[in-house]
Amino acid sequence: MTSFLRLVLLGFFLIFVFAVFCTPPALAQENPYIVAYDHYLEEPGNLEIEYFSTLGTQRGGNNFHAFWAEFEYGATAWWTTEFYLDGQTTFNDSTVFTGFRWENRVRPLKGEHFINPVFYVEYENKNGADKILKEVEGHDVESDFLVSNAQARKDHIHEIELKLILSSTFKGWNFTENTLAAKNLSNSPWEFGYALGASRPLALKASAKRCTLCPQNFVAGVEMYGGLGDWHSFGLHDTSHYLAPGLAWNLPSGWTLRLSPSFGLNNNSHQFLVRWGISREINGFGSMVSRLLGGRK
């Protein structure tokens, strides 16, 4: 493991300790999606720290464990910005840091509507060994992961990713559709993809008592996501697709746990992925930092 990756992990650990001991619990109801996005943004001034992990099978090669940390901040009521750090371990190969991402989501309309649009812009600086599968785009297929880490790391990727998120909530149900367009800043064509999601709490009525295993603390859902080819060959040919049920457990302490097995839907896909995540929201993080730096409350 490189010294840079050790430093990143140490910083992530220290911030997580801060989240546990220095902040009141957050009561937000998180969805179970790993790939799809709904229209809900981070509350202004709040910071959410998240860790996600993907264990993937690899036919003809070594299985892998990909992981990433997310730092999501509510800049305003209509703008959420997020920073990612990615890495992966390929069994019988090595552990590598694969890059970073800077994501921004903007919600142009106030209030709730039948369809709530969100505009998504992300810059990715990564290498070819990245395996987090945060999205599937273009002609991404399982065989892409057969290259060794040493060889894949030589491929440096600078990419802009755009999404249009259309999300609705009706009688407790959330339905979301994400359309993706990504452009490697080298001489490569635009690539396309999609993600669909539906979710609902197991119970809509909150309990009068604080409890851990109450049905309303669990949100169940399902995602489907995959690639749609590129500018020169748009469509389903030579693309991969996945179906992923998911469950989010929102604890009264403010922690959220997620679990989502993913099943490949064709021969171009990984047969099976297991994803899980843990997150914690720090209320009033922006105000705390402002006070520490001598700013106004």
Task: Pin down the residues of each PLM region.
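N-terminal secretory signal peptides that target proteins for export/translocation
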Residues: 1-5
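Short helix-onset patch at the extreme N-terminus, typifying the N->h transition
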Residues: 6-8, 34
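Bacterial N-terminal signal peptides
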Residues: 8-20
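Transmembrane beta-barrel domains of Gram-negative outer membranes and organellar outer membranes
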Residues: 28-297
